[in-house]
UniProtKB/Swiss-Prot annotation:
Residue intervals passing through the bilayer: none
One Pfam family hit: HAD
Pathway listed: Amino-acid biosynthesis; L-methionine biosynthesis via salvage pathway; L-methionine from S-methyl-5-thio-alpha-D-ribose 1-phosphate: step 4/6
Catalytic activity: 2-hydroxy-5-methylsulfanyl-3-oxopent-1-enyl phosphate + H2O = 1,2-dihydroxy-5-(methylsulfanyl)pent-1-en-3-one + phosphate
Molecular function terms from GO: 2-hydroxy-3-keto-5-methylthiopentenyl-1-phosphate phosphatase activity
Protein name according to UniProt: 2-hydroxy-3-keto-5-methylthiopentenyl-1-phosphate phosphatase
Matching NCBIfam families: DKMTPPase-SF, HAD-SF-IB, PRK09552.1, salvage_mtnX
Domain of life: Bacteria
Species of provenance: Bacillus cereus (strain ZK / E33L)
Family: Belongs to the HAD-like hydrolase superfamily. MtnX family.
GO BP annotation list: L-methionine salvage from methylthioadenosine
Record keywords, A-Z: Amino-acid biosynthesis, Hydrolase, Methionine biosynthesis
Amino acid sequence: MSIQVFCDFDGTITNNDNIMSIMEKFAPPEAEEVKNRILSQELSIQEGVSQLFQLIPTNLHDEIIQFLIETAEIRNGFHEFIQFVNENNISFYVISGGMDFFVYPLLQGLIPKEQIYCNETDFSNEYITVNWPHPCDRLCQNHCGLCKSSLIRKLSDTNDFHIVIGDSITDLQAAKQADKVFARDFLITKCEENHISYTPFETFHDVQTELKHLLGVKL
């Protein structure tokens, strides 16, 4: 049995949710209603995120990237955690509902690109269009956009020990099929609502400590 780690990006690897930061800085006021409808699950993640980015003019591309480079912070302990999983031959994937134009630059030098799965953006028109290269498979009908549970099924074997690390509603479907969940923020609420066992965390030092214990117990 091997351990597979599937980790969210926004609000998990980074301290802040970069999509929400973009919306607060660059989107018109109507973005707030769309965000609330996503969190209440009135809108699917795919529908809601598409609507949010359709509110952002493409001519802000360079300004948005510069803003994120200046404001995004990598969560404490992440660098050491990546070193730990690499040293222990643990498979690590970033499965992010974030966008290629900021996920790749912020993880450059930390995670190989082939281990990162995120959404794609098109800046060729007046407003940003989101493309969805990792849709739901036949076992998921939640219109996730980037379907984390489908990616877990694609990238791993059913006999693997699946660990999901996340913070929000976008991680819920993945958490439902994980053997171990590390949760913070809104994902804690959703895990409790859905009776999903989880371990809370604030830094990746917390995750690493628990993973060391798992290595001793599970392997």
